[in-house]
UniProtKB/Swiss-Prot annotation:
Active site: H240
Enzyme class, UniProt record, top EC level: hydrolase
Protein name as it appears in the record: Creatinase
Species name: Bacillus sp. (strain B-0618)
Reactions mediated catalytically: creatine + H2O = sarcosine + urea
Subunit: Homodimer.
Length: 411
């Protein structure tokens, strides 16, 4: 009689399917992995074991769903294999750029058994193994070290983040489509705004519009993770506040935040709006924030330092005694990221980031101030555009208008 312990620990599971149409060309994915392997050779790293959503997706075109299971992408000079859980069956192979191996649930250490098997097949039994210190847990690190005792674990997270910060033409095309779809979501949000409508209904209407357009534009893609934060009144105080059942009221400050997700890539549209009317103090604060936004758009160009952009914009807020009302940095890089993975922290418009803007980078301008509840003009004010930096300057790929001339919504 067959026992659970008799079942195989790993398997190659294609399930009779074929590879799906990839997000990017073979040439693009080869370029990314060639650059990775060149870095590995230069740094004396024999193999890399990626564990994060963003790096596995960036180098393999497969975005996993963890549900407390482990996933990996193992890369050597000769092997490129995603390691996925049996619960996903053949989907990871269909979506992976290269090979895939499945580990089963039947023994607790099957994940590392599969990783070790791939490494051994790639000629690695000892040496320097690249890992992501900013993602790998202490428990997993200990388990890897126990499974590979003659291995030195070397952090590669910062180096590969530097690779991801520069976008290829294919990536920029996808990001431009994302910005276009975010604008569609924004228009749908405005369409749904009415006094008495709850926040979540507005968010749902915009999300549906974006998902449908992603499906139309990328019929081969998984449809996942697209969302909207739509906030009203006091709920606008935090940029990352989720929709609630609060019903919109006349005179409300509103915050529209649309995030279409395409194959793990993030784009965004964020706008301040008012319902029907705006008080004098609200209008004054809104116009100040728009002034900062406009100046920020002018400052983003090749050769500018992130910290210098932040410093100049701080002066505008300081002139109006609003510097202390800022809530976060002025912008960040775009690419493979979401609210639960990614973030290219080396490319953010903050006072402590010395990075110089270069062609191939894609960044946002998104100033925000928050006035506490109970004070005149209370609420959160935020505008957000996406800019592509090239040899010739910058291109603003966000088309949705901002400011009082456009976004006092009258129904």
């Amino acid at each position: 009689m067959q026992q659970i312990t008799d079942l195989e620990r790993t398997k190659i599971l294609q399930n009779g399917g074929e590879k799906v149409k990839p997000t990017f060309s073979k040439e693009e994915m080869t370029r990314r992995n060639t650059r990775l392997r060149e870095y590995m050779a230069k740094a004396g790293i024999d193999a890399v074991m990626f564990t994060s959503y963003h790096n596995i997706n960036y180098y393999s075109d497969f975005l996993y769903t963890s549900f407390n299971r482990s996933y990996a992408l193992v890369v050597t000079q000769d092997k490129h294999v995603t390691v996925s859980a049996n619960i996903d069956a053949g989907m990871p192979w269909r979506r992976s750029f290269d090979e895939n191996i499945v580990y089963t649930d039947w023994k607790r250490d099957n994940f590392l058994y599969a990783v070790k098997k791939v490494l051994n097949e790639g000629g690695f039994s000892s040496g320097r193994l690249g890992v992501e210190n900013d993602h790998m847990t202490l428990d997993l690190r200990r388990q890897v070290q126990d499974a590979l005792p003659n291995t030195e674990l070397v952090d590669v997270s910062q180096a590969v983040m530097g690779h991801r910060m520069f976008k290829s033409d294919e990536e920029i095309d996808l990001i431009k489509n994302g910005a276009r779809i975010a604008d569609i979501g924004g228009a749908a949000v405005v369409e749904a705004i009415r006094e008495g409508v709850p926040e979540y209904e507005v968010a749902l209407h915009g999300t549906e519009a974006m998902v449908r357009e992603i499906a139309r534009t990328y019929p081969h893609a998984e449809l996942r993770d697209t969302w909207i934060w739509f906030q009203s009144g006091i709920n606008t105080d935090g940029a990352h506040n989720w929709a609630t059942s609060r019903k919109l009221q006349r005179g409300d400050i509103l915050s529209l935040n649309c995030f279409p997700m395409i194959a793990g890539y993030y784009t965004a549209l964020e706008r301040t709006l008012f319902l029907e009317e705006v008080s004098d103090r609200h209008l004054e604060l809104w116009e100040i924030n728009c002034k900062v936004h406009r100046r920020g758009l002018e400052l983003i160009k090749p050769g500018a330092r992130c910290m210098d952009i932040a410093a100049e914009l701080n002066e505008i807020y300081r002139e109006h005694d609003l510097l202390a009302n800022r809530t976060f940095g002025y912008g960040h890089s775009f690419g493979v990221l979401s609210h639960y993975y990614g973030r290219e922290a080396g490319l953010e418009l903050r006072e402590d980031i010395e990075t110089v803007l270069e062609p191939g980078m894609v960044v946002s301008m998104e100033p925000m101030i928050m006035i506490p509840e109970g004070e005149p003009g209370a609420g959160g004010y935020r505008e957000h555009d996406i800019l592509v930096i090239s040899e010739n300057g910058t291109e603003n790929i966000t088309k949705f208008p901002f400011g009082p001339e456009h976004n006092i919504i009258k129904k």
